[in-house]
A protein has these predicted regions:
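Glycine/small-residue-rich hydrophobic helix-like segments
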Residues: 152-184
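Transmembrane beta-barrel domains of outer membrane proteins
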Residues: 19-23, 70-74, 113-119, 144-148, ...
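Outer-membrane pore/translocation modules
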Residues: 30-138, 161, 171-173, 203-207, ...
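A mid-sequence, solvent-exposed acidic-amphipathic segment
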Residues: 129-148, 152-156
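Short loop/turn motifs that connect adjacent beta-strands in outer-membrane beta-barrel proteins
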Residues: 1, 23-31, 76-82, 119-125, ...
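Short glycine/serine/proline-enriched coil/turn segments at secondary-structure junctions
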Residues: 10, 26, 135-137, 167-169, ...
Length: 226
């Protein structure tokens, strides 16, 4: 399975990756997951700019690159799939600041990941994802619930909530609505034969503790079983 995602807002993150299950994504068995992502977020430069000494730190940008390769086991049941992963991760981050005299070295760490994709009934979907890593001492989690209304859409529609935190003290909370597991109509891509290409979109309210102002966010995820 190939996948990619974009999380856009005041801070943004884009990633892509692949999942491989030798016995099939719908069966019990081993599974591996590899990802590569890039993030960009604004923050105050309290350390590298002289204006910070006067209490007026300018805004700067933090660039982050993360990569991970984890392996684990998935359990497939009639109600859905659950999986646990562990493996190494690599992180590199740098500030657009006068105090950045040279690029820092990448940091190596360990990553743990848990996923749940469950259908309690034929018309409902519950998802949960939790990722924790030591390269940046970061954690990200998201839960969602959705209901499928065939008269309106093939997607599951419902609420979602997410939280991200890392060692810098940065915290980002979000609450919104999502549409999960739908394809593009042929009228949009009439020349492409990708009936298995699926999508997830969401949008809502986000609050970043360091900025202390609410904002809005939007996400787009696509996956293609192979």
């Amino acid at each position: 399975m190939l996948f990619g995602s974009l999380d856009a807002g005041r801070s943004s993150f884009v990633s892509a990756g692949a999942k491989f299950a030798p016995d099939g994504v719908g069966r019990d068995g081993p599974v591996t997951l590899a990802t590569l992502g890039y993030g960009l977020r604004p923050e105050r430069d309290w350390w590298g700019d002289p204006r910070a000494q006067a209490g007026r730190p300018p805004r700067t940008l933090r660039h982050t690159v993360q990569a991970g390769a984890v392996a684990g086991w998935q359990w497939a049941r009639d109600w859905g799939v659950a999986a646990l992963f562990a493996g190494p991760e690599l992180a590199f981050e740098v500030l657009d600041s006068p105090g950045t005299e040279r690029l820092p070295a990448p940091r190596l760490g360990a990553r743990m990941q848990a996923e749940l994709w469950a259908r309690p009934t034929d018309a409902t979907l519950v998802t949960a994802t939790l990722i924790g890593g030591t390269a940046r001492w970061s954690a990200w989690g998201r839960v969602s619930w959705g209901v499928r209304l065939p008269a309106l859409s093939e997607a599951y529609l419902g609420p979602e909530a997410a939280l991200y935190a890392d060692r810098t003290g940065y915290r980002k909370w979000s609450l919104g609505l999502h549409a999960t597991d739908f394809g593009l109509p042929q009228i949009i891509l009439p020349q492409m034969s990708l009936p298995q290409l699926r999508f997830r979109v969401s949008a809502g309210w986000v609050y970043e503790e360091q900025i202390r102002r609410p904002g809005i966010y939007g996400t787009l995820t696509a996956w293609l079983p192979l």
